[in-house]
Amino acid sequence: MAMNTGGFDSMQRQLEAELRSLSSESKRRNSTIRHASDKSIEILKRVHSFEELERHPDFALPFVLACQSRNAKMTTLAMQCLQGLSTVPSIPRSRLSEILDAFIEATHLAMEIQLKVLQVVPIFFKTYGKFIYGPLCKKLLLCCSNLLHVPNKAPVVVGTASATLQQLIDEIFDRLSIESVVDDKQYEVLISNSESIKVNVYRYDANKLFDNICSLNEISSNGAVSDEEMLLDIGDIPIDYGLEILESILKNSQKNLLECQDLQYLLRVKAIPLLLRCISSSRHFSTAVRSCRCLKLLIRKEYLSILELELEVILSLLIHGISVESNLSGWQRVLSLELFKDLSQDPEIVNTLYMDYDNYPDKKHVFKYLLKECIVLLNSPEYITFLAPSKVVEKMDSPLITTENSTVKTKFMHLLDKSNAPSINITYIISLILTICNHLCEGLNKSALESSPLEKKIEDKEREEGTGNDSTVVKVYSGLFSGLFELNKLFLYSTSLETSIFHLVVRAFQKLAHSAGVLSLKDKLRACMKLFSILITNNVTSSNQYSFNDTSKSAKNQHTRNISTSSVTTSPVESTKNPSRSIADSAQNKEMKRRLHPRNISSRQVSLLRALISLSISLGPIFDSESWRYTFLTWQWITYYIYGPSADFKESFYSEDIPPPPILTKSDVTSIESSLTKFFESTSSYSCSTFHLVLTRLILDSKNTLTLEQTNLNLNNDIGYHPLDAKDEIIPCIYNKAFFVNKIGELATYNCKKFLFGKNGKELWSLISTYMIKLISNREMDNDSLRLYTVRVFTDIIKKATNEVGNSDEQDNKVKQFGTLENLVIDSLMATINSIKQLDIGKQEIYNGTINVESDILFQLLLTLKEILNEFGELLMNSWTNIFNIINSPFEWTVEDTDFSVNEDIDDSSLFEGIVQKHKNMIQVSYDVFKLISDDFLQSLPMSVIKFVIDTLVNFVSQKRNLNISFSSISQFWLVGDYLRVRFNPETLNLSDEKRRSLSEKINNQKLIEIITSSSSHDWELYNGLWIYLLKNLINCTNDDRVEVKNGAVQTFFRIIDSHSVCFPPWDLIFLEVIEPLLTKEWSTEELENETDFINVTLQGLIKLYPEHFKDFKNNTTCAKEWSMLLDFLKRLLSSTSNNTKNAVILNYQTLLKEIITIEDVPSDILKKCCEIFTDYNITYSDLSTNASSKTEYDCIYELITGFPPLYQLISKYDAMTDEFVEKVLLLFNSAIKYPLLPEFVQDKTKPSSMQKAILSGLDIFMTNDSKDTEILILLQLSTISILAFDTREKITKKLGPKLPKASLNRLPTFEAISYMSCSNLRNRIAKIDQFGISTLKAKHILRILKNLAEIIKRKSLITGSESDEIPIWVLASNCFCDLSNKIFKSLQEDAENPLKDNFCDLFINVIVVTLQRINPELDNLTEIDDLNEYSKYREILLENRIIDLFNERQLDTFIYAVWDCSFLYEFDELENALMQDCGTFSELSQKLSSFDFSCIFGSTTNPRFQTKYKCSLECLQDLVNFMLNTNEKLRKLTAPYLSARIALALRRYISDEYLIGRAPIPKLRKTELATLLNGLCVILRGVLDQNSTLGNKQIGVENLQTLSPLILRTIPVSHKMDGLQDKVLELSLGFTKLD
């Protein structure tokens, strides 16, 4: 039953109960105990607290007595009470000794009581410990030590006693920290051999106790120690237990040992010698274990200052136990290694021990010797067999050293219950050494990181401050490095290690290397990196072992996974270059090829690679160039092992020549990928200087790799074909030349933002771009695929950089960063292109495919630019100039088509076609880029860039590869115009007079380019200069050979003008720079022939432009010049042989004339040029075009004629009409109207052709109120046109008829309709003329008019107008002649001396004669009425008194003769013809007929044949009579012979015939004839005989008439046959008688 210690009341009740039980139990056995118990009960009843209880010494007496009784039951009851009293101070100090004696007595009883004592004693000491010292302390310890000596003791008692004893000893030592001591007594104790100090009772107890324990070995060997010196009876304590107690003291009382000099002294002179003896001389495993455990507790940093020499001896002893030379047992070596293993886990103690021992040459080195001995041990035959090292990293099939067989369940130092050592396993010893090595590496790494953090190292490196680190860690590391390095190397080359153990070694070695880096120990880091590279890359045991893997390995591993180019692979794309060269080389050198290095690699090497990469990740910021060299070259070789040679290398080898891939699991490859990804990610934290170093190393390695081929031209050299050289230095891999280019690219893509770090970032970018560009433009590279791969990597860098910055979420920061990046990126693209452009291009470059490759390079660069613009164009700000230079790069590709055509050696047309197609593709991509800019970013461009936009457009327009691009580019000019329009600000860009003069002066001085490119130009200068530059270049595009492009360019030009002219600079500048070159361009015949549409559009635009912007002739001094050049331009174009062109020009000329009319103050020179264009037109009669869409000369002339009205209007507006102008116009009209061929399917019989009508309309425009001279010219032209249907038609028919095909004969013009209409117009115009003054100069024109009319009248043409009731043309002409004659006669009456008179009178007489002439019966019948009418009109005019006087006798005689000739109704018979031929004059004829002998010559019974036009004849008969009655004497005189002869002939025929016909009736016409003549003669005679007659000089003609008297008399006999005849004859006979 356990005593409850809850409180005094509870304790009181329990004690009372226990005391009563004790009293009851002792009642019969021991009265003393009973009385004592009762007394204690009484005491208990009186006290109320523990303090009161403590004042009663007798209270504890029953318990002491009960224990002394050795009665088990009473002792048990007493122990129960003592247990309770032990928990609280309740026993008087005076009773403590008795109580302890009671405990000692109780230890002799049963086991339960013994255990109870052991349970109570620690509690008792805890409560009353301050009073227990000296003898009491000895008694206290005796309570436990007694139980250790009991024979046949139960293990539980011994174990509990042992534990309790250790607890009490620990508490005795812990008591040293109590400052208050109940006893002031002091004791002397030694602190050295000659010194002592005084200590209190507690410390004295501890001193004696520690001395007793450390004297175990002395007691056992020298016998008992005096009682006074013994605090603990250890005479019979086993050495092992004593060492256990010592271990406990060393473990739990370290503080006291370190603070108390007396204890330290005992430690040096007692404890350590004891341990050394036990460990060196003991053959007992357990004793050695306990000793080692104690030593382990002493080998601490805290003890070094007090046990320096002792520990040196201890450690040396332990190390000696490890060595091969030691004669100690194996388990002792194990114990030493285990101890050092534990020590190695504590970096602090390692560093401390090193600095205290290894750091001094005069001291025993600890860890150096340890590592040395371990190395020697491992290299011993016994151990080296187990390691089974190899020259390459590999693993045996069944590893000898595994986790299972190299470990023990319990460490030897923990085998406390083993008296004999277990069997020794060599693998365990190896494992211990390996672990020590690992721990030391890890400890050094930890210490290095703590003493010199990596961050600080990086900062120091950035500041380029050498650390100058002479710290403890550096010394320790430097001292241990060689040993650790050799151990790690030994383990790494071991083939017997299990994989997991190998990984531990790798990790340890990695930490060793990492520590070197952290501590800036470059040589040691390089050594580690070198070993790493050798371990990883060396996969053959000797240089002769360069054969393929065995059959089992030759098959392609199904588990090997292809890896993306973003991680390890660096295989560039296959070359697009003509492979003929490489294939030829391959065939030629097949026998000379070197055998490729095997590609086998183990998983262990993969592990090492991962460690190397991990090391690069952690130490990258402080790596030097050499460390990076080992890293990258190792990486390069591994890439070859896993993925084989790069594509460029494969081109020179057959696939069967390439070694098979290694057998790796998918996880192996994945782990490599993962590690490399982490490596790339880690570089993002690199500083710019570190990153610069990495890139520099990569570039250097890349250069070295690319030069390997040249180094190995001698087949005896094989540098780069194997990873290690003769000195075991790793060298670049020739199988993977593009590796470093790939790594540069990947590193750059992971560190894009570093390029934004100001000057450092620019240097980084420059480093990369300069090298990349150098490679891209290097034609000396062995394989062009490397160039293509490089450009792909470079563009990937660019795209990644722009993507990373451009996709940033921080808008403000993004804009700023992209502004920095864009210059780097775009400048690099431009520099790349420039490097390509600078290369010469010759026949060889074309033929060997170099140009093909470089075209692919340019294409890739353009695609990159396109992607950048497509994604982030809106962020671009400063690099637009270079962007446009890049866009223009395809146009500077100097490979021309002629380079191929002139090369006869190049037979492969596919080569040419391929290059041309690539050029097309480049241009297409370039245009796509530009289109992207123009669609999305044009409005955001600065004005300083617009020049480049325009230049780019010109290049796109001018290129000949893609017509669609040329078309589309032309329309882009419109967008540039919109751009400029949007930026127009009237307030800032409008030009003052001063600004205008300044701008004009610069442009006149050919400084336009300077204006738009100079940063010093004002905004208004730049703006206006860009407009001029835009328009000028757009016009320059019209010089393109392709008609479609020319048309599009000029159309866009004028559309821009229409839409944006309000924003334009001064028009005089535009004219000077833009329009004038267009107007002064020299046109070839071919151009004029083929570019009609262009010319037409150009003229349309110009004609629209000029009236709007060049109309101020009054204020603009250059306006006249500008118009003059335009008109000269038109005139030059009209010299074209192309009818289409001329037609277009003429149409635009018409429009221009209409526009000029609206302009005021047009100068005379301009008017003159306008006229000259019209009048100087050269009409050529050429037609016969078979193309319906083509224009003919006829069309041109027609359009020209239709344009005359506005010209006339213009001339009239300024009163500039001159005779010269009119004559030239009419000359043109005259030439035009005689055009010898009509258009297809056109007839001009009933209505005039279009041109004929146009000419007539043109003539109609001339007003009758124009000058008289002009009017005469118009009349002349109309008259000339009127006769076209006659002579001109005949000439055309005669000339062209034989030459034309029959189908075209109907195209010959008849001119009938136009002649008629012209004649009609002539009559109308004549009718409008009131007076007709005839100048001498115009007389010939008038005569010509009359002659033309006379010609028409003469021909008696029956041509009529379109209306059926219209009169024939000859009558119309006669009317004109008649009207005109009337007006002329009026003029001549006033100017009788006019030279026109005689000619006109001749013409007039001729016209009258024509009306009386007989042509042919058919025509005469048709014209008789008109002839009679026309004759009558003329006769009336002629017989007017003042008019007839204008005619001379010859003219009148001609007229009278015509009348006489027309007066015959019948044809002459032979007799009459003979008579007339015999007679020279009509008077003679009359005389002869008067004396005619009717008896000899008879008439005829048949009537003679009638003549046509009898009505005219009758009229003429009457006129002959009337003429004799006319008052004009000259007329009568001239008429008399004719009338006399006429009557004589009539009478002769009548007389002759009537004698024959007898009673036959006389024909009516004969009757009429005779009646008319004889009646007229009667009238004449009456007038002559009448005194009152108005006739003057009545005798005129009487003589001639008197010759008729005989015939009159002869008629009388036959006069009765005709009614009235007889009377007339008789009257005449009487009259003649009167005359006589």
From Swiss-Prot:
Alphabetical UniProt keywords: Acetylation, Golgi apparatus, Membrane, Phosphoprotein, Protein transport, Transport
Record keyword Metal-binding present: no
Region (Disordered): 547-596
Compositionally biased residues, Polar residues: 547-563, 577-589
Locations listed in the record: Golgi apparatus membrane
Recorded superkingdom: Eukaryota
Other notes: Present with 2410 molecules/cell in log phase SD medium.
Family indicated by similarity: Belongs to the MON2 family.
Name the UniProt record assigns to this protein: Protein MON2
Species of the source: Saccharomyces cerevisiae (strain ATCC 204508 / S288c) (Baker's yeast)
Species lineage: Eukaryota, Fungi, Dikarya, Ascomycota, Saccharomycotina
